[in-house]
């Protein structure tokens, strides 16, 4: 596990922590099934990932996402450029996904 989150993870965490985003409770850098996820909301079974250059191996990410999906989670991935340039779009997508997950329960 990293000791220092990368820039874009820090930006997302500022929005997600302390239930700032629509009252959703997220944890960061959480280990689940041997994987470290950037942010996780257990109530909505939602995982949010900030994707930087280290995520160039899409096959590995896809296998990881499939495993998480099989555990009942939905994984949202946002490229760093989207977090930087279209932050409101990212926030809207996270809230919509959480609402969708809640209405399915």
Residue ranges and their predicted role:
Residues 1-25, 98-105:
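Solvent-exposed, charged helical/coil patches
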Residues 1-6, 30-97, 101:
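Basic, amphipathic alpha-helical patches used to engage nucleic acids or provide basic targeting signals
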């Amino acid at each position: 596990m990293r000791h220092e989150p990368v820039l874009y993870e820090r930006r997302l965490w500022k929005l997600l922590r302390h239930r700032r985003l629509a009252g959703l409770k997220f944890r960061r850098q959480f280990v689940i099934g041997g994987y470290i996820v950037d942010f996780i909301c257990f109530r909505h079974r939602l995982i949010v990932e900030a994707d930087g250059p280290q995520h160039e191996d899409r096959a590995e990410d896809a296998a990881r996402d499939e495993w998480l999906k099989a555990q009942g989670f939905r994984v949202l991935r946002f490229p760093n450029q989207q977090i930087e340039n279209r932050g409101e779009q990212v926030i809207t997508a996270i809230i919509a996904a959480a609402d969708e997950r809640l209405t399915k329960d």
